């Protein structure tokens, strides 16, 4: 499990993006952000909701729906978004700092 790995979301359509620092990998939970289908009616807010392409589809990072899940729910990653670190961190900063 690594920060910015993407996992299938068994609860709803879309994925979960792991945003927790790898330093805390000993915990039995992970902080995640849902990645929702861009055609699902969710209107992205600039800076808060970047859009990523995963498995040929476009998915919105629903930063305001940040949650914690048991690590055991996250199986094999289907994608890695480490190359989008700046966009992801900017969205988290927008949520917590307002900029």
Where are these regions (language model features)?
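Residues at structural and domain junctions
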Residues: 2, 18, 74-78
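C-terminal terminal-subdomain/extension
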Residues: 56-99
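N-terminal glycine-rich FAD/FM-binding segment characteristic of electron-transfer flavoproteins
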Residues: 52
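Compact nucleic-acid interaction/catalytic patches
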Residues: 3-6, 15-48
């Amino acid at each position: 499990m690594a920060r910015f790995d993407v996992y299938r979301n068994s609860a709803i359509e879309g994925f979960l993006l792991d945003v927790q620092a790898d330093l805390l990998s000993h915990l039995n939970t992970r902080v995640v952000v849902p990645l929702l289908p861009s055609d699902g009616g969710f209107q992205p807010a600039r800076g808060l909701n970047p859009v990523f392409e995963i498995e040929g589809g476009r998915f919105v990072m629903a930063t305001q729906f940040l949650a914690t899940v048991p690590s055991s729910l996250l199986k094999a990653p289907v994608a890695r978004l480490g190359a989008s670190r700046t966009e992801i961190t900017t969205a988290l900063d927008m949520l917590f700092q307002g900029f």
